[in-house]
Structures are given as structure tokens and as C-alpha cells.
């Protein structure tokens, strides 16, 4: 029997392969696959259920229906293996050959393959250089095409209608040849000489002038070359023989009641065969042309439907009016072969159930219902029962398990011990969505989950379900235990912070324990150690919050690595002393000697992990959880209506705001402010009123007055339950409490604009009908958004995974000196991210020197850990160059040094780590979370009240960055440049804060002045945009004609008149071409120039501009000539966020992108055209000047005669990533995308490490455009993989030839995924038809380099534990093959097996 098994194993071993090639099948190849021709459309006999002969299920062609048994039953059993029955002609073999044997249909007339015809760009069309319309007319028999013009005036490929053809026949007789249908196209394709075509086009290319024509020729050249190099012949795009799928892949199953369930393919094949047979008969009968033509057209259409139903014309429908599923539909889409069966499979040994809390479990455990465990571990139990001799056979064991005899439970306990199971919660958004636990058997039917891992799973216990999977093999168990165990996944791979931090009840319990209460029972006592404090608490002498003195013992590790104990007395509370009991040895008492909110607990765990390692942290986390639950129970915190204390100041604040609004309303009615300004100001008033109310409310809630020991009144932090929940971070936020006890505030309409009347009531007071109605808008919008955005976010994740899936760490060090320059991130004045956080876990690219010296502080290639970061901070270094995956030089992967620290493990990354997938998950996972978290604040509009000044937080010196300014009559600076920033520098020269200041800002201080903290140093009006003059003089109106380009509005109250410029659209025809502007003139009427230039001082006025001065009025420097009202802003919420991230990663061009200077030089304006200005930049070195047409309505940041640098902003707008890459280089575009993406996530309080975004950017930058081909094979203007070009260039340089030059190109993630080298990966992502068509024509072969391709072909992935397997295979392939001893062929094995079995058979 053993031998027998050996043979079976040998038989099933597939041949090893290194790649998969796709190409066009020639008719001969199709025939060689085939085991016979299918001639009849019959399937199976409805009475006998036997397949019909020569039909679609014929046993003779495709193989027997039953194992080792022919159709008529003459030969049965294994001993007749390989015999072909002389009666029914069926070979006696296994029935599984019906899954692999193909048939064929000989078509009576050739048929075009619809993919090469209709999938754009049409390959047949490109090949013949004809339009798709024309080819279709030929194929569907509407017109003739000339094939052989002979000596006539016709041309090859010319289209002739029926009449033209008859005329030509009369004129030329049979001198020429014209046909219609696929035969004609076949002959045209056959006549193409590929080599000659390539030569002709290569010669023609340099002389072509028109851009479109050149593009077309290049396209065609690429196609013809692809055919030539791949060895495909163009005529193979036309089918003469149609392959027939093996019958078991298009099954037909009899249902009861004489009906059949069948695959749609059978219908489609039947149609083809019927029409084909009819056509054959018609041809034999020599039927009239018109009938034959119609039949041929129908044959063409039926083959089209079989290959890709619905691509041309109406889809063929089945009996139930739904389109039939064609071969193309089988492989594409979510339900297609790729995504349904190859990339996602169903797994056995799994179960699912509802989850509940397991507060008593350890971190590495989960509670598994006994019933489930019994089912999941059945085979193990059977084996154990037999092994122990409790059951003699498997059958007996089965019976025992079914009866659930007591021994079975003992065996189950034994089987389960140390056998991890994997728990998974859908949706699995990141790798922490599947973790391994040791099962603990429990009664009941719900799986128990440890509370601390809920955050990673994003699970809650409101009915969530989870699936259990059992790793079977020893290797699988080992991997589950060492890599996936929940205790090994304490840090999040997205940001390297603990992911098992306590939340909710636990936080509340710990917070409650660590609070102090003035004059609590036992205040002022002193204890000799923590145990004594505990005794006092247990006996009721001192309460939990009493302030006491305790002597504590701390353990610390000194430099020599010895443990040193120190004792000291601390002022603390009884509760904190109790907490210190569970603190692991080696952590400082100060970590718990504070109010333990969620942030503090997270920091505590992080410190514990970094200082003491994994094991201690896991034990500590569990202890924290048990303690937290215990004290949360004891605290008795609850929510009552009286806890929501409404502040007394609320009513006066609301009344004040209402008065202000009335005042503005009056101003509006008297025409002092415009409607837009009024709306904005009203909303600002209410926003700030809301802020004040909520401040008052929080102040009221957070403090309470108590009597201390000396009998005096004292303020202490309140023990109000709601305040404690919010303050500790357990549940709720200030915004939510504001709605409960303050005022609900401003609401948004469904379109996102803010309703100007706020809800002044709160939930405690209750809402009246109108208030309730307004608030339903926001709530409903939130819910609708959530549903839509979850889908969007999932799609974003899928695209990210797809673009990054093949990026793996494959070498130690690529040796590059390049990297990204890191600086602290400063935004809105605050340091959002200090340098240490940005460089932590990175590798230094170039030596960092001590400031002001030549001493090397941090040498190159140092991995910066916490200790190094402290050194960097102490030396106040504010920028350094660190290695990044974007600048990594490794081909087809990245190196360890460029990636740096593995965030989830805390040491440098290992080889074989799939960093691409981790990056995609880290970015995609919060996306989904964010999308699901819009509506929790009930749609309350959170809009920052518009900023109108800069108030500094630190003292220091004022510095201005790229700012132009003028000094006004009061001696103050007025900013007249667009993207100016002011920074505060401390005495060490470190930047402390940085602010963007808009055009028109008035500064209270001069540059290099000292400023004190809290000073307001800059002011501006946020609602209007001024136009400021840079010279003094009197003003002169140009093109300002009342009723034509402007109107006068007089204020009834003040009698002042103001001038409003009309939009171009509102002007009468006379004013369309006019350009209203203000020119400044000197006293003598001569034009004034802008200082330092030869440009006259004239200011164009855009539409809606309001001028408050009259013609010839005098004006000073720095005064406003006009003001332009700004529109109101919509609410910002992640809705803007998620699409924003998608836009960045898709590298989409914004609607009105910023215009950047293409070259460095001097600005001037050329001749104007209708609606556009001509901007000219003349380089200083006298090179070619650059011109650009800019629409007149764009606000320019530059004036005539100014100097600009390449890549500087000329006109404001959103910057397009492609422009940044082209003009400022890779590092700038990387910084731009990283910062923009981070802004969106930071707004939501989500932390993601920059590395992950950089990984995606690296994948977006993998392609380049060849500028000059040098001596390489590439074509100029061709897109190629950067790594390919680099490898080719290295070879060329080694031979002393000219390398190719290239420009990097930025592709969006979808485009980048589709442009990968691997066609399998691209086809399984999107646009399957197009990808496969392109790959087949080029005869591409897939080297199976990425993860996805390997999953699809069913191999281990070349990452993680599968990495070494692929390494070994590569090494084996590199060595010459050693001849194997007595290798045995499959046929020999089969023969031996048959002999063995015959022997066995003759004995019984």
C-alpha cells in the first residue's frame, strides 16, 4: 500500500515553472489541444442522462463520465486503464480528465476575435491602419474591402459599398479582388510583412512634424514590433478554429423534475454550433450570396457573444431576460475567476459566532465554545482517541464524538492545549484583523474576546460576529504562535504605538483610582510602604482619593546594567499607591503619580515596552485591565440628568450674540455690508458665542468648591461623572458635552452650507420642533455619507494594496547617499510634529554635525532610536537628511536601511517583509474608520471662526519668510506678497512657531524685533481681500464707466458712495473688452512706477471689487485701493478628507491648478488675446524665453519686471503634483504628497508614519519617460520602468556606450497598478479585458515577482516566511542541475501503479 501512495504522489506533482506566458493561439495550436471536434449542439440525453455522441458533452472527446468505466459499460475497473472501448470509443481513465480535455469547432467561415477588434485601441484597426467603423462594416457584411487591386486605380484596403463594387466589377472585370467578412480581414492581415512595416515606420518617424500623426505612428510601431518580437502572427487575431472548454468547467446538472441547471456557456456554444452547421449546409447547397452572408454575420455575432457578451450590440439574453455570462465575464469583476476564486478562497476548519466580553481572560487567550471546538478539532480528536486506544477505528471514534462521551472532553482539552486558533473579524482592514489566540473552552455559544484586542479588530459587542480558523500543520501553528499571537502584536504597524491600550471602562476605572480629593478621609497620613497604604484602604481608614505620603521602592538599571534599588517618600494618593503595585519593576513611580487619562496610560504602556520589553508589557497590560474594571465597578460612575450642569452665563452670552447679530442685520439693511459679508459675520458671531458657552460650561463642570482641612474653601477638579468620562478619554468629548449642557450650535444644511440661525437649546433643555427639524438634516446627511464613504474607502484600500503589493525588503543596504531632508512640521504657529517624531526609527543618510562645529554627532547609517533622538533634541538640530524608500537604489524592492525600523516590532526591518502591503493597510484602514465616524457629533457644524490675527505663544525674535512689504504712513509694515510666512525664533536659533499671513496683513512689529508671548503681532480682515498700493500719489480711473464696467452704490445712512466693479458677464457689450483699473499718477500727472521696476503702478480690478475712493483722490503707501469680498466657506469634515487623499494618490490635476514658473527669469506681459493674458518669462542667461497664456480672471502673484525662480507660484491655486515633480524634483513632490495626506489624517487625530505614504509614492514614481534613448533599445517618448532603464544603463556604461536619459513620471495609483510588469496582477485588478488583450498581443511573460501573482498561481508569496523558499528556488535555478538518480516519468509511474493494482485486484 505504501508504494501505491508513493506512486499517487509522484503522479500529482506538477512541473515546476518560473513564469507564465500569454499569447495568441494559432489554429494549429488549438487543434493540437483538442481531443476531437464537437459537431452537434446536443448536450445529454434527457432520459438516460448519458452524453450525446459528438455533442458538447461527448464522452469520446472529453473522457468517461465515471472513473475507469466506459460509456457502454463494457470495460469497468482499474485493470482496463488506458483501453479505448471499441463499441463506444471512450478511453477508460479517471473522470477528472473531463476538466482538462478540450474540444474544438471548425468554423465554416473565419471569425474576428472581438477582443482584438473592440477592446480599445482596436488592435486589428491599428494593424491595418483602418478605422474601427470601416472594419466593422466589412466584418458585419455591410461593405466590401479591396484585397488585391491588381492593375486597377483602386487601392488596397479601400472600402467599397455594394453599388461601388458592382460598378468596379463592370469596369475592371476580375482584374481586382474585393471581399467582405472576416475572410477579407484575414487576407489583409496575412499580407502584412512585419519586418518591412517596422523598417518603413522607423525611417518615417524622424521626418513627421505633426504631433498627433507621430503619436499614431509610434503606437502602431509599438504594436507591430510587439507582434514581431513575440512571434505572434497578425492573422491569428481572426479565428478559424474555436476551442471548446472542457465540459466539467461548464457543468450541466439534472435537477429533480426533469429540468436542468446549466452554465450559460453551453447555451452560447450551442448557438455557435447551430449557426456553424447551418452555414456548412448552406455552402454545400451553394445558396444565394445574401443568405450565406446573413448566416456568416450571425456566426460572427454568436462567437462574439461567446467570447464577450454585450461588448458589441445588445447582449444575448437567456430565457429569463438576463444577459448570458460569457467567457470574458467569467474572469473579470468581483465575481470573476480572479477575485472570487484565486485571490479569495473559502477555508475549511473554520467556524463563526457572535462575540462577547472575556474580562477574565489573559491577553493571549480567547474563549471558544465547547461545541465549536469539538467540531473544529474533530480529526485531532479522532487521532487522539485511537492513539490512546479508546477507540479501535475511526468509525468508532466518530460514534464516541457524536455521543459526546465524557472521555471526549478530556481528549479535547488535551488536543487544544497550546494549539493556537486564529480569530478574524470582517472587514479585515489591516493585518491586526486576524490574530492568533490560545483557546480556553467555555460553556455557551459565543466566542469570548479579550477586551484589549477590540481596538485592533475595531470590534464591539453589539452583535459583531467573528470567524475562527484552525492552523493545521505544525509550520502553520508555529507561524501563528510566533508571528500572529496577540501578545506579539502590541504595537500598531501604522505608527509604532501600542494598539492594545485600554479604553472606555478600564480608562475610567484607572482615572478614578488616580484622582485626588481634597480633605478625603485619611488625608495627611504617612505610610511606610505601599502594603500599609493598601491595608488602610481595605480597613476603611483612608479612602481611595486621600492625599497621603508613602515611602516607595524603585528599581532602576544603571549604566553598567545592574539593577539598583532606591527608596524615597512621595506625596501621592492611596489609589495611586495601589496602582503602583501592578507597575512592573524598573518603571518610575512618577508614571502613575498623575491623573491617568487615556493618553497617560498609552504613554505608560509605550514606555514599558521600550524599557522592559514585550513580556513585562503583556503581563502589565492585563493587570491594568483587571484593575481598571475593578475600580470602575467600585466607582459607581453613572450618568444622571443633573450631571449636565447648564452654566448661568449661557443666557447672557446668547443674548449678547443676538444683539450683535441684530446690529449686523441693521448694517446690512442700510447697505454697509454685503449679503455675503453679513452671512459670514453672523456665523462668526455664533461660532464664537458657542465657544464661549462651551468654555463657561466646561469651567463650571470641571471644578467644584470644597472645604479643606483648614476649613477654607478651595477649588478642586470635579467628580462629576460626565466630566470624568470626557476628561479621562473614556467616552465622549467636549463637543458632545457642549451639546448636552451648553448649546447645540450651528447646523449644516444637506448641501454642506451652514444655517445661520443656530440651535441655542441643548439636549437637557430639549429642542422645539423647528430646532429638532434643523438638526435632522445633519444627522441624516451623516448617515448617508457613512454608507457611501465606506465603499469609497474600501476601494481606496484596494487600489493602494494593488499598487504596492510587490514591494518587499530584499537587501541589506543599497548604499545610496540620498534621502529626504526632514524638518519639524510647523502649522498654524504650533509645532505639529517635532523633528524627533519624524526621524525616529529612520536611518541617517549623511553625517550630522554638531551645530557650529565639524564634529560628527550622528554618523551615517545610524538607526535613530529613542536614545539617539534625545541626543538630537539636546543639540537642537532642526534639520537632517534621512534615508527614504523614495530614494532607495534597490531594483525590484527596497533595502533595510532605506526603510529603517519595523514599526510593529521596534527593531530594523527584516528581509522579506512585505512593506508595500503594510503601508497600504496602514493608510487604508483609518480611511475606513474615518468614513464611519462622521455623524457622531450629530452633524453639528464645526467651523473654525475665521482667523484675523496672529497672537504669538512664545517669546523670541520675529523673522519673515519670502515676504514683500511696504511701510505705510503709520510706519507699520503691510504685506504685499501672497505666500508669506512669519516665524518666531528663540535665542538658540530654533524655530518655535510659524504662521502663514495673507496679502494685506498689517504687522505691529518690524523684522528682527523681539516679541513677547501673547502679543498680537499681525492683523487682517478675513472677509475681504484688499488691493494695496505700493506707491503714494493720486488715483486715476481707467475704463471705469458707470453703467458699463461699474455701478455706484450710495449708503443711505452715511451718504458715502462706493463703486462696485461688474463681472464681465454682467456688463453690456460695450464693456466686455474693457479692463477697469486704477493707475497712480504723480502731482504733475505723470505715471508712477512700482519701486525698483520700470512697471507703471496700475492695479486691475476684478469683478465684485468695491472702491471707496473717488477719481483723483490722494492716497498713501500701504493703503487699500479696493476690497474684494470673500465668499463663505463650507464645513470641513473627512468628506473633504477621503476624496482628497484619493485625489492625491491618483495624482489628479486640480480644477484650477496653481501656475508655476517653468523657467527662472524675469516676468513681462505680452500681447493680450480675448480673455487671456500672455505671460512671458525671459531667462537671465538669455536663453529661449517661455510664454504661457493665462486666463484674465486668474489672480497673479507677480508683477511685470519681477524675477521668479523655476517652480515658484505665479498664480494661486492648488498645486498639481505633476508640476511639482517636473519643476522642483522628486524630493519636493514627495514632501508635498506626504504633508497633504498627513494633513487630512491629522485633522481626524489619526497617526500614520510618513514611511507608509513614501512607500506608495515610490510605487507612483516607478515609471519614467525616455528623453534620449542613447545606445539603448528604448524609443524616445516611451514609458518604461525606472529599474529597467537603470539596469540597462548600467550595462551600457559598462560597455562604454551612451546611456539613456529619462524624466521621472508620476502616475496615479490606478494607472500605476495597471502599468506593472506583471499582467496577471494588472488583470486581476481592473480592466481585465484590456490588460489581457495587450499582454497576449505582446506575448508577455509574467515572471511572478510580486505577491499577487504568486497567490494566483497558488504558491507561497515571496515575502515573510515564503521569502526563503523563493530565495532557495532562485539559488537552485542559478546552479547547474544535478542529474537526479532514477527519475521516473509520469507514464512509467502510472504503468507501475496499474500493475500493482491489478495484482491487488486478482487477489480479492
UniProtKB/Swiss-Prot annotation:
UniProt binding sites for Mg(2+): 460, 462, 464
Pfam families the UniProt entry points to: RNA_pol_Rpb1_1, RNA_pol_Rpb1_2, RNA_pol_Rpb1_3, RNA_pol_Rpb1_4, RNA_pol_Rpb1_5
Reactions catalysed: RNA(n) + a ribonucleoside 5'-triphosphate = RNA(n+1) + diphosphate
EC category: transferase
GO annotation (BP), single: DNA-templated transcription
Keywords: DNA-directed RNA polymerase, Magnesium, Metal-binding, Nucleotidyltransferase, Transcription, Transferase, Zinc
GO cellular component: DNA-directed RNA polymerase complex
MF (Gene Ontology): DNA binding; DNA-directed RNA polymerase activity; magnesium ion binding; zinc ion binding
Keyword Nucleotidyltransferase attached: yes
Binding annotation for Zn(2+) 2: 814, 888, 895, 898
Cofactor(s) listed: Mg(2+); Zn(2+)
Matching Gene3D superfamilies: 1.10.132.30, 1.10.150.390, 1.10.1790.20, 1.10.40.90, 2.40.40.20, 2.40.50.100, RNA polymerase II, clamp domain (4.10.860.120), RNA polymerase Rpb1, domain 3 (1.10.274.100)
Cofactor binding note from Swiss-Prot or TrEMBL: Binds 1 Mg(2+) ion per subunit. Binds 2 Zn(2+) ions per subunit.
Domain of life: Bacteria
UniProt-listed InterPro entries: DNA-dir_RpoC_beta_prime, DNA-dir_RpoC_beta_prime_bact, RNA_pol_asu, RNA_pol_N, RNA_pol_Rpb1_1, RNA_pol_Rpb1_3, RNA_pol_Rpb1_3_sf, RNA_pol_Rpb1_4
Binding site for Zn(2+) 1: 70, 72, 85, 88
Record-annotated disulphide pairs: none
UniProt KW Magnesium keyword: yes
EC identifiers of the protein: 2.7.7.6
Subunit note: The RNAP catalytic core consists of 2 alpha, 1 beta, 1 beta' and 1 omega subunit. When a sigma factor is associated with the core the holoenzyme is formed, which can initiate transcription.
Family classification: Belongs to the RNA polymerase beta' chain family.
Job of this protein: DNA-dependent RNA polymerase catalyzes the transcription of DNA into RNA using the four ribonucleoside triphosphates as substrates.
Record protein name field: DNA-directed RNA polymerase subunit beta'
Organism encoding this protein: Shewanella halifaxensis (strain HAW-EB4)
Higher taxonomy: Bacteria, Pseudomonadati, Pseudomonadota, Gammaproteobacteria, Alteromonadales
Amino acid at each position: 500500500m505504501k508504494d501505491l501512495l508513493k506512486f499517487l504522489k509522484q503522479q500529482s506533482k506538477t512541473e515546476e515553472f518560473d513564469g507564465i506566458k500569454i499569447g495568441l493561439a494559432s489554429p494549429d495550436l488549438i487543434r493540437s489541444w483538442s481531443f476531437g471536434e464537437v459537431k452537434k449542439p446536443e448536450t445529454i440525453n434527457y432520459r438516460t442522462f448519458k452524453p450525446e455522441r459528438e455533442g458538447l458533452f461527448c464522452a469520446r472527446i472529453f473522457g468517461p463520465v465515471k472513473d475507469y468505466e466506459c460509456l457502454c459499460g463494457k470495460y469497468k475497473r482499474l485493470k482496463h486503464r488506458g483501453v479505448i472501448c471499441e463499441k463506444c470509443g471512450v478511453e477508460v481513465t479517471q473522470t477528472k480528465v473531463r476538466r482538462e480535455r478540450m474540444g474544438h469547432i471548425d468554423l465554416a467561415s473565419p471569425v474576428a476575435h472581438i477582443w482584438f477588434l473592440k477592446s480599445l485601441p482596436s488592435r486589428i484597426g491599428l494593424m491595418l491602419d483602418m478605422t474601427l467603423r470601416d472594419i466593422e462594416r466589412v466584418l458585419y457584411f455591410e461593405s466590401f474591402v479591396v484585397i488585391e487591386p491588381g492593375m486597377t486605380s483602386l487601392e488596397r484596403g479601400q472600402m467599397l459599398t455594394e453599388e461601388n463594387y458592382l460598378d468596379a466589377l463592370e469596369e475592371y472585370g476580375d482584374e481586382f479582388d474585393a471581399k467582405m467578412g472576416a475572410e477579407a480581414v484575414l487576407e489583409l492581415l496575412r499580407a502584412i510583412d512585419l519586418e518591412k512595416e517596422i523598417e518603413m515606420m522607423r525611417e518615417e518617424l524622424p521626418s513627421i512634424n505633426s504631433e498627433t500623426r507621430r503619436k499614431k505612428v509610434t503606437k502602431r510601431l509599438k504594436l507591430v514590433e510587439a507582434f514581431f518580437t513575440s512571434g505572434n502572427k497578425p492573422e491569428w487575431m481572426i479565428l478559424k478554429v474555436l476551442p471548446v472548454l472542457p465540459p466539467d468547467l461548464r457543468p450541466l446538472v439534472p435537477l429533480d423534475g426533469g429540468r436542468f441547471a446549466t452554465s450559460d456557456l453551453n447555451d452560447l456554444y450551442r448557438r455557435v454550433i447551430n449557426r456553424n452547421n447551418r452555414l456548412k449546409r448552406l455552402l454545400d447547397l451553394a445558396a444565394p450570396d445574401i443568405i450565406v452572408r446573413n448566416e456568416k454575420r450571425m456566426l460572427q455575432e454568436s462567437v462574439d457573444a461567446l467570447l464577450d457578451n454585450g461588448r458589441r450590440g445588445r447582449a444575448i439574453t437567456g430565457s429569463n431576460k438576463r444577459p448570458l455570462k460569457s467567457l470574458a465575464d467569467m474572469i473579470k469583476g468581483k465575481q470573476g475567476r480572479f477575485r472570487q476564486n484565486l485571490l479569495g478562497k473559502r477555508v475549511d476548519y473554520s467556524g463563526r459566532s457572535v462575540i462577547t466580553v472575556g474580562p477574565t481572560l489573559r491577553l493571549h487567550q480567547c474563549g471558544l465554545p465547547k461545541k465549536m471546538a469539538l467540531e473544529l478539532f474533530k480529526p485531532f480528536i479522532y487521532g487522539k482517541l485511537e492513539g490512546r486506544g479508546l477507540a479501535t477505528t475511526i468509525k468508532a471514534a466518530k460514534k464516541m464524538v457524536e455521543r459526546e462521551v465524557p472521555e471526549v472532553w478530556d481528549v479535547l482539552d488535551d488536543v487544544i492545549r497550546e494549539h493556537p486558533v486564529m480569530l478574524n473579524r470582517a472587514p479585515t482592514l489591516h493585518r491586526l484583523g486576524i490574530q492568533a489566540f490560545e483557546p480556553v473552552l467555555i460553556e455557551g455559544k459565543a466566542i469570548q474576546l479579550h477586551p484589549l484586542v477590540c481596538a485592533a479588530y475595531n470590534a464591539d459587542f453589539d452583535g459583531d460576529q467573528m470567524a475562527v480558523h484552525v492552523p493545521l500543520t505544525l509550520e502553520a501553528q508555529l507561524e501563528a504562535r510566533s508571528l500572529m499571537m496577540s501578545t506579539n502584536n502590541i504595537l500598531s504597524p501604522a505608527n509604532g504605538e501600542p494598539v492594545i491600550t485600554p479604553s472606555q471602562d478600564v480608562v475610567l476605572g484607572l482615572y478614578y483610582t488616580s484622582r485626588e480629593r481634597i480633605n478625603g478621609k485619611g488625608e495627611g497620613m504617612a505610610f511606610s510602604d505601599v502594603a500599609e497604604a493598601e491595608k488602610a484602604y481595605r480597613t476603611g481608614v483612608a479612602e481611595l482619593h486621600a492625599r497621603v505620603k508613602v515611602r516607595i521602592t524603585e528599581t532602576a538599571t544603571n549604566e553598567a546594567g545592574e539593577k539598583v534599588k532606591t527608596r524615597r517618600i512621595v506625596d501621592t494618593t492611596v489609589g495611586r499607591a495601589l496602582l503602583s503595585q501592578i507597575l512592573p519593576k524598573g518603571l518610575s513611580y512618577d508614571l502613575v503619580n498623575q491623573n491617568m487619562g487615556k493618553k497617560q496610560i498609552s504613554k505608560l504602556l509605550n514606555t514599558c515596552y521600550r524599557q522592559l520589553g514585550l513580556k513585562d508589557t503583556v503581563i502589565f497590560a492585563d493587570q491594568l485591565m483587571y484593575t481598571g474594571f475593578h475600580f470602575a465597578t467600585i466607582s459607581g460612575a453613572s450618568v444622571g440628568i443633573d450631571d449636565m450642569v447648564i452654566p448661568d452665563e449661557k443666557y447672557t452670552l446668547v443674548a449678547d450674540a443676538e444683539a450683535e447679530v441684530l446690529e449686523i442685520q441693521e448694517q446690512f439693511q442700510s447697505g454697509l455690508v454685503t449679503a455675503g459679508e453679513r452671512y459670514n459675520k453672523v456665523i462668526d458671531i455664533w461660532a464664537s458665542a458657542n465657544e464661549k458657552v462651551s468654555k463657561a460650561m466646561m469651567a463650571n463642570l470641571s471644578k467644584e468648591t470644597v472645604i479643606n482641612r483648614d476649613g477654607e474653601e478651595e477649588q478642586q477638579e470635579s467628580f462629576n461623572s460626565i466630566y470624568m468620562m470626557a476628561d479621562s478619554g473614556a467616552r465622549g468629548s467636549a463637543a458632545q458635552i457642549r451639546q448636552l449642557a451648553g448649546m447645540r450650535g450651528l447646523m449644516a444644511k444637506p448641501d454642506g452650507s451652514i444655517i445661520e440661525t443656530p440651535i441655542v437649546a441643548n439636549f437637557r433643555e430639549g429642542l422645539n420642533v423647528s430646532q429638532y427639524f434643523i438638526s435632522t438634516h445633519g444627522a441624516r446627511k451623516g448617515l448617508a455619507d457613512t454608507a457611501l464613504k465606506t465603499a469609497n474607502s474600501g476601494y481606496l484600500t484596494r487600489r493602494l494594496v494593488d499598487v504596492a503589493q510587490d514591494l518587499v525588503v530584499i537587501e541589506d543596504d543599497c548604499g545610496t547617499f540620498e534621502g529626504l531632508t526632514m524638518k519639524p512640521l510647523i502649522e498654524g504657529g504650533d509645532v505639529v510634529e517635532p523633528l524627533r517624531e519624524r526621524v525616529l526609527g529612520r536611518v541617517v543618510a549623511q553625517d550630522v554635525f554638531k551645530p557650529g562645529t565639524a564634529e560628527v554627532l550622528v554618523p551615517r547609517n545610524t538607526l535613530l532610536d529613542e536614545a539617539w533622538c534625545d541626543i538630537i533634541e539636546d543639540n537642537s538640530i532642526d534639520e537632517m537628511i534621512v534615508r527614504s524608500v523614495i530614494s532607495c537604489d534597490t531594483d525590484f524592492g527596497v533595502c533595510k536601511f532605506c526603510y529603517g525600523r519595523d514599526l510593529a516590532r521596534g527593531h530594523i526591518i527584516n528581509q522579506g517583509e512585505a512593506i508595500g502591503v503594510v503601508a497600504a493597510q496602514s493608510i487604508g484602514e483609518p480611511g475606513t474608520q474615518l468614513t464611519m465616524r462622521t455623524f457622531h457629533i450629530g452633524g453639528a457644524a464645526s467651523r473654525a471662526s475665521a482667523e484675523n490675527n496672529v497672537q504669538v505663544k512664545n517669546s523670541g525674535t520675529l523673522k519673515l519668510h519670502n515676504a514683500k512689504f511696504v511701510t505705510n504712513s503709520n510706519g507699520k509694515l503691510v504685506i504685499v506678497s501672497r505666500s508669506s510666512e512669519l516665524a518666531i525664533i528663540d535665542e538658540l536659533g530654533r524655530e518655535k512657531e510659524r504662521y502663514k499671513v495673507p496679502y494685506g496683513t498689517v504687522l505691529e512689529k518690524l523684522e528682527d524685533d523681539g516679541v513677547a508671548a501673547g502679543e498680537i503681532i499681525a492683523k487682517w480682515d478675513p472677509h475681504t481681500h484688499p488691493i494695496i498700493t505700493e506707491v503714494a500719489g493720486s488715483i486715476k480711473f481707467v475704463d471705469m464707466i458707470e453703467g458699463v464696467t461699474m455701478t455706484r452704490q450710495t449708503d443711505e445712512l452715511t451718504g458715502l458712495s462706493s463703486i462696485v466693479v461688474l463681472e464681465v458677464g454682467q456688463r453690456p457689450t460695450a464693456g466686455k473688452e474693457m479692463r477697469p483699473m486704477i493707475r497712480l499718477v504723480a502731482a504733475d500727472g505723470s505715471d508712477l512706477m512700482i519701486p525698483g521696476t520700470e512697471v507703471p503702478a496700475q492695479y486691475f480690478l476684478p469683478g465684485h471689487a468695491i472702491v471707496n475712493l473717488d477719481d483723483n483722490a490722494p492716497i498713501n503707501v500701504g493703503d487699500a485701493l479696493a476690497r474684494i469680498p470673500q465668499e463663505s466657506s463650507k464645513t470641513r469634515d473627512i468628506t473633504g478628507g477621503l476624496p482628497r487623499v484619493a485625489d492625491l494618490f491618483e495624482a489628479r490635476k486640480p480644477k484650477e491648478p496653481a501656475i508655476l514658473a517653468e523657467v527662472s527669469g524675469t516676468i513681462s506681459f505680452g500681447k493680450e488675446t480675448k480673455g487671456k493674458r500672455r505671460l512671458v518669462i525671459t531667462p537671465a542667461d538669455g536663453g529661449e524665453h517661455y510664454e504661457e497664456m493665462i486666463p484674465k480672471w486668474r489672480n497673479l502673484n507677480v508683477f511685470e519686471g519681477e524675477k521668479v525662480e523655476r517652480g515658484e507660484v505665479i498664480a494661486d491655486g492648488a498645486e498639481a503634483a505633476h508640476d511639482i515633480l517636473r519643476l522642483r524634483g522628486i524630493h519636493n513632490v514627495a514632501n508635498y504628497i506626504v504633508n497633504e495626506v498627513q494633513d487630512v489624517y491629522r485633522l481626524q487625530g489619526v497617526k500614520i508614519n510618513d514611511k507608509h505614504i513614501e512607500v506608495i509614492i515610490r510605487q507612483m514614481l516607478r515609471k519614467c519617460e525616455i528623453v534620449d534613448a542613447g545606445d539603448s533599445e528604448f524609443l524616445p517618448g516611451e514609458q518604461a520602468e525606472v529599474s529597467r532603464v537603470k539596469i540597462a544603463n548600467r550595462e551600457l556604461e559598462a560597455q562604454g556606450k551612451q546611456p539613456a536619459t529619462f524624466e521621472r513620471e508620476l502616475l496615479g495609483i490606478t494607472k500605476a497598478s495597471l502599468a506593472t510588469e506583471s499582467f496577471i496582477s494588472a488583470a486581476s485588478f481592473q480592466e481585465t479585458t484590456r490588460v489581457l488583450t495587450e499582454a497576449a498581443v505582446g506575448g508577455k511573460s509574467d515572471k511572478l515577482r510580486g505577491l499577487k501573482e504568486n497567490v494566483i498561481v497558488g504558491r507561497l508569496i515571496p515575502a515573510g516566511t515564503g521569502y526563503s523558499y523563493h530565495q532557495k528556488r532562485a539559488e537552485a535555478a542559478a546552479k547547474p542541475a544535478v542529474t537526479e538518480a532514477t527519475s521516473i516519468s509520469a507514464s512509467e509511474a502510472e504503468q507501475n501503479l496499474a500493475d500493482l493494482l491489478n495484482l491487488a485486484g486478482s487477489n480479492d
